[in-house]
């Protein structure tokens, strides 16, 4: 009886050790984390956004940059600058601003419609966030954008979406001339 109990305890210990090792590998390896989040929560890309009909959730894990009147169903966190460049130039600059973040991948782009979509991951846990951008004409050789960054996982993002949006906007204002009114 004691030998059977010892075998059971030893087997349980080995199983718990294997589970702990697997958990460590899954949480410490970036590729494994991405796989784990996809397995638990589905594909990381949350899909396209129509800024004209956008309604934000009640959770604090989104950030919206939108010109006045373009997002009538949502309150923006910030207004974007108007750039003294044509929309295709701003479109290319948005791509470059996003690519400067090492954990960001472009998942969709339509130059004719002026839309881009990215999956950006947080540095430590690699939580996926979807960033949708629409580049808008704002007059002759002038353009602006709408940007919506939202988390797939969790209720709070500890400000990650807002920091990302501000970082991208800072890159754009450094790279492009801002229009004077």
Go through each PLM region and give its residues:
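Ser/Thr-rich, low-complexity intrinsically disordered terminal regions
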Residues: 2-12, 22-181
